A protein has these predicted regions:
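Active-site acidic/histidine proton-transfer and metal-coordination neighborhood
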Residues: 3, 79-181, 261, 280-281
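Glycine-rich, proline-tolerant flexible connector loops at the mouths of alpha/beta enzymes
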Residues: 36-57, 111, 118
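Active-site glycine- and acidic-residue-rich loops that bind
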Residues: 43-45, 127-129, 159-163, 184-194, ...
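A short acidic, helix-capping loop that chelates divalent metal ions and anchors anionic groups
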Residues: 73-79, 115-121, 157-158, 191-192, ...
């Protein structure tokens, strides 16, 4: 294996938005040190509430490094006539200020409900709006608070705009800023027909990765879940592309399974798959 084929962060983080203290303790016990939190969820809290939350994470030696859920549903949709740029601008500024104590290596911009394009709406116009919103309203906050935002592709059942990593990369390319990239979600990517063979086409823009099993109804990755070969090919393609950022598990635990045991099994499984590409910095 070439020395160049390594992951800078070869230990997965866990998405813990909405987790109780008990679940956070189980996350720690499973082996996790890093977590991904809910951005809009935290943005709705007071500063003292965020301090309390960070204290709980610290109690379990969990470091927040990423966030998902950039926009809350209360802001409405971009293209249905209800969009209020003033209200959105106010939210963005307040959200970054409220969460300023967390250094976000990645904030994912999914929000499929907001970006759905109505029938008959010009797609080029939608893209121009999206690029303008990121460039004019979001990038200044990313610079001010030393954060990165990654555009998440979502399968067609969740939205009809930006359904592939390639499309997300087109947006990131148009924004043309080092703090804006692509969140490559293995689950959505697979559901949208992209494979490891497609990674090279958008790899330069990938700033974060989400993992869940497409075969097992978006569950956390596990041995024997039917996706092992696809995981291995995906990780190899990322390593060959020079990917050097984090991975987060964004999957659930099937009903009837032991949560703590399943989480530990997933962590052990993924760290084993990462092992050929592991570097000293984790």
């Amino acid at each position: 294996m070439s020395d160049s084929l390594h992951f800078t962060y070869a230990k997965p983080a866990m998405c813990v938005g909405g987790f109780s203290p008990e679940r956070l303790k189980q996350t720690q016990d499973a082996g996790f040190s890093f977590v991904e939190v809910g951005f809009s969820e935290l943005a709705a809290k007071t500063e003292s509430q965020i301090d309390e939350y960070l204290a709980v994470l610290n109690q379990y030696s969990l470091t927040p490094v990423a966030a998902n859920g950039f926009f809350p549903s209360t802001l409405g949709a971009f293209f249905d006539g209800s969009f209020d740029i003033g209200k959105t601008r106010e939210y963005i500024a307040r959200a970054f200020e409220t969460t300023r104590k967390i250094h976000f290596e990645s904030i994912s911009f999914g929000s499929g409900f907001m970006r759905r394009v109505p029938d008959g709406y010009d797609r080029d116009r939608a893209k121009d709006f999206f690029v303008g919103l990121l460039t004019d309203e979001v990038v200044p906050m990313l610079e001010k608070y030393d954060a990165r935002l990654n555009i998440e592709e979502l399968q067609e059942s969740e939205t009809n705009f930006i359904n592939t990593c390639r499309e997300a990369a087109d947006i990131a390319r148009a924004v043309n800023h080092p703090r804006v990239g692509v969140l490559c979600d293995f689950y959505h990517m697979t559901k949208s027909g992209e494979t490891a063979a497609d990674v090279a086409g958008f790899a330069p823009y990938v700033g974060h990765v989400h993992l869940a099993s497409p075969t097992s109804s978006r569950a956390v990755p596990l041995p024997g879940d039917g996706d092992d070969e696809a995981y291995r090919a995906f990780f190899k393609a990322l390593a060959q592309s020079g990917y050097d950022r984090r991975f987060s598990i964004e999957g659930g635990v099937a009903s009837g399974r032991d949560f703590a045991g399943t989480l530990k099994e997933s962590y052990t499984y993924l760290t084993g798959l990462f092992a050929p590409y592991e570097s000293e910095k984790v």
